[in-house]
């Protein structure tokens, strides 16, 4: 794949965004063929591989048929394939292979376009670690007073995606081919799932992820430039007030000031700090400004989606939250900002100045109740939180049982290492360790006391890695309850977060 992308940097068709000639290159479908076999089921016999009867002229004829098809004569790119497609040489296998080839070309082309976009944006950083988002929020968000919680719209008409592709694909044949594929993609969904037309189905996840990434890239290429213009339209008078960040809050909390003093003039001098983070479909825009400025920003977002993408976003997809008064949910954490008073002592020659600074403190909280619901669903405990044994694991070896509980414990503690409610995580640790002992006791037909006496201190440590000991040490009771440890190696969202996110989205949409 990397060689194919390096080849694209030299080829004129890539540089000029004329992609249609590349659809008929045989080496492209060699790559697509390998990707197709990688995602095929391992239970399929290897001697019935598609490579035994793959014909490149058949691929060419199929591409021409896709371009010439109408609604009454559908090729069936997105229909469920016959399980015996290798034996029957079903045409759907060729359709999926063509779809893989088209996706490879479009992915490489989009990667080249997005690389130029990111290089051209000053200050734009794309990071892989999820916890890097929390470190940014810890550093920057306390200086904001509003946050817009945005869910990117999902329901997208095929013609909107075609318009998106027209900005970086210049040849008409490629656009006609993509239009035919996208309309068939939309028609493959049922009426009740039409509003989630970009949710990846299991059969064509690669193509669906490409559509999602290209759509988000197009949104951000416009949105970031608008935010930067909005940021540069600030008032320059703010620079002459170095203590302006905390000045308003001091006025609110010092009662000796007369009531007639109004803070409206101070608000007019302030300009909005704007910070934008996104993971998946959830985006956060933190602003420091007046409520009117924040509402104006939301108004521009609605106009942005309607003007560029002809989308009417539901009101629940853009929420304005005041940081000092509410909790909000993001990436599996409940986030809040509580007001905190800091005493600063400054010594200047013979004088000692003492100043009180009122600042917002970032407080990420692990959703203990949702973790308990997930553990109840997976039968680690009952509804009341009492641990129970995993009878289905009694046929495993002792090391395998310890490894499974260790993996579950490590995933939870590693992901929520930055939360402040460590007492709740101690209880989660207890719930996971006790079922481990109960499962071993059921396997050996004994009691928990007998298992602990026979294994001693090695019961929960003989198969645990040093990484686990490091994680548990950060959650030891000798550690400060306010201390946070963010892990920069987490590049994938936790399965608990996905489970809780679905419940949270359903509650919002009601």
From Swiss-Prot:
Instruction: Classify the source by domain of life.
Output: Eukaryota
Instruction: Tell me where it resides.
Output: Plastid, Chloroplast
Instruction: Report the main location listed first in the record.
Output: plastid
Provide the alphabetized UniProt keywords. Chloroplast, mRNA processing, Plastid, RNA-binding, tRNA processing
Cited InterPro entries: Domain_X, Maturase_MatK, Maturase_MatK_N
Q: Cellular component per GO? A: chloroplast
* Entry keyword annotation includes tRNA processing: yes
Q: Name one Pfam family in it.
A: Intron_maturas2
| UniProt GO BP | mRNA processing; RNA splicing; tRNA processing
One function term, GO molecular function aspect: RNA binding
Tell me, in a sentence or two, what this protein's role is. Usually encoded in the trnK tRNA gene intron. Probably assists in splicing its own and other chloroplast group II introns.
Cross-referenced HAMAP family: MatK (MF_01390)
Protein family membership: Belongs to the intron maturase 2 family. MatK subfamily.
Under which name does UniProt file this protein?
A: Maturase K
The species this protein was found in: Taxus cuspidata
